[in-house]
């Protein structure tokens, strides 16, 4: 019985081990590839739990999301013979899920070593070999990452379509200490020169600002003067218009008054012409004589009542009036 129990226990253990080796998990953002007897199977699997034949089938999980591959301490010899080292180069890339099988089949699951690491080493050495230290370290350093990205992506499009390079980041290379000090001194001098240039620009900017302020102030004064001048001109024009209106009104009033006076005089003259007839004048004459309380003496008194042609006789009668008055006064004195 004990022997049979041991056999049963061994069988259960084997079954448990087989189940344990058959069940596996693929993480999110990964693709599972399978090997049987060392041969890559065409079957791939996505995230989750999966089953496979125990003991004879194995799997590897290949990342298909963004990942960063680091290449460290890359040597590089410049055209001048100076050996420099790039401490760290980071390549951000991702693998398209549909291309996982072909990439793994052609370059194994560690495809990044064959396709990325080696290409970075090759491109950096090519770049350094045709440029001197000044160009690599300072002048062209900002172009290295972009050039590496373009060269790497172009090579991958031919050899392994499905790998996308998103970015390449290159750290400043390490250079010999003596050369580094010289570069530091040179950078210090450049910094001083830049500071001096910036100070000069600041002074020029301040002068330009002052000039613009003066121009703005002058323009403001000119605009104010122009506004005042226009205001005065408008006031004078307004006064002129008011004066013209007043003159026009005065002329109109005077003309109206003259027209009225002329009309009145004309009407009066017309009325007098119609009124002062010879008969009416004769009547007025008689009324005036009748209203006179004085007594006239003389032989020509009757002639006063003649027509206007007897004018001289009337005058002589008047003279007689005066003489008679004188005689009257003399007679009074004698008495």
UniProtKB/Swiss-Prot annotation:
CDD domains: SPFH_like_u3. The chain crosses the membrane at residues 3-23. GO terms for biological process: cholesterol metabolic process; SREBP signaling pathway. Residues 24-335 are lumenal. Pfam families: Band_7. It is a single-pass type II membrane protein. One of its GO terms (molecular function) is cholesterol binding. Disulfide bonds: none annotated. Its main location: endoplasmic reticulum. Keywords: Cholesterol metabolism, Endoplasmic reticulum, Glycoprotein, Lipid metabolism, Membrane, Signal-anchor, Steroid metabolism, Sterol metabolism, Transmembrane, Transmembrane helix. One of its GO terms (cellular component) is endoplasmic reticulum membrane. It is found in: Endoplasmic reticulum membrane. Glycans are attached at residue 106. SMART domains: PHB. Belongs to the band 7/mec-2 family. Mediates the endoplasmic reticulum-associated degradation (ERAD) of inositol 1,4,5-trisphosphate receptors (IP3Rs). Promotes sterol-accelerated ERAD of HMGCR. Involved in regulation of cellular cholesterol homeostasis by regulation the SREBP signaling pathway. PANTHER family: ERLIN (ER LIPID RAFT ASSOCIATED PROTEIN) HOMOLOG, ERLIN-2. This is Erlin-2-A. The lineage of its organism: Eukaryota, Metazoa, Chordata, Craniata, Vertebrata. The gene is erlin2-a.
């Amino acid at each position: 019985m004990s022997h049979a129990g041991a056999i049963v226990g061994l069988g259960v253990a084997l079954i448990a081990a087989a189940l344990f080796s058959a069940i596996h998990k693929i993480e999110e953002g990964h693709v599972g590839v399978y090997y049987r007897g060392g041969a890559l199977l065409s079957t791939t699997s996505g995230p989750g739990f999966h089953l496979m034949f125990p003991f004879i089938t194995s799997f590897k999980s290949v990342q298909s999301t963004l990942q960063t591959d680091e290449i460290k301490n890359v040597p590089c010899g410049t055209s001048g013979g100076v050996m420099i080292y790039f401490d760290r180069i980071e390549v951000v890339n991702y693998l398209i899920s549909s291309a996982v099988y072909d990439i793994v089949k052609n370059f194994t699951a560690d495809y990044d070593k064959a396709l990325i690491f080696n290409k970075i080493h090759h491109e950096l050495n090519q770049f350094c070999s045709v440029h001197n230290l000044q160009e690599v370290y300072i002048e062209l350093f900002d172009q290295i990452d972009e050039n590496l990205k373009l060269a790497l992506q172009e090579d991958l499009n031919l050899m392994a379509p499905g790998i996308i390079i998103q970015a390449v980041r290159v750290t400043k290379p390490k250079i010999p200490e003596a050369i580094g000090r010289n570069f530091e001194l040179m950078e210090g001098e450049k910094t001083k020169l830049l500071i001096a240039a910036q100070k000069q620009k600041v002074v020029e900017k301040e002068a330009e600002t002052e000039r613009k302020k003066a121009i703005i102030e002058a323009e403001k004064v000119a605009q104010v003067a122009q506004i005042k001048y226009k205001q005065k001109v408008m006031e004078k024009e307004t006064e002129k218009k008011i004066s013209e209106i007043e003159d026009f009104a005065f002329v109109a009033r005077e003309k109206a008054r003259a027209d009225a006076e002329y009309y009145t005089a004309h009407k009066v003259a017309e009325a007098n012409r119609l009124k002062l007839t010879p008969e009416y004048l004769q009547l007025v004459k008689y009324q005036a004589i009748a209203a006179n309380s004085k007594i006239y003496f003389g032989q020509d008194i009757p002639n006063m009542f003649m027509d206007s042609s007897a004018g001289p006789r009337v005058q002589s009668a008047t003279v007689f009036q005066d003489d008679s008055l004188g005689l009257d006064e003399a007679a009074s004195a004698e008495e």
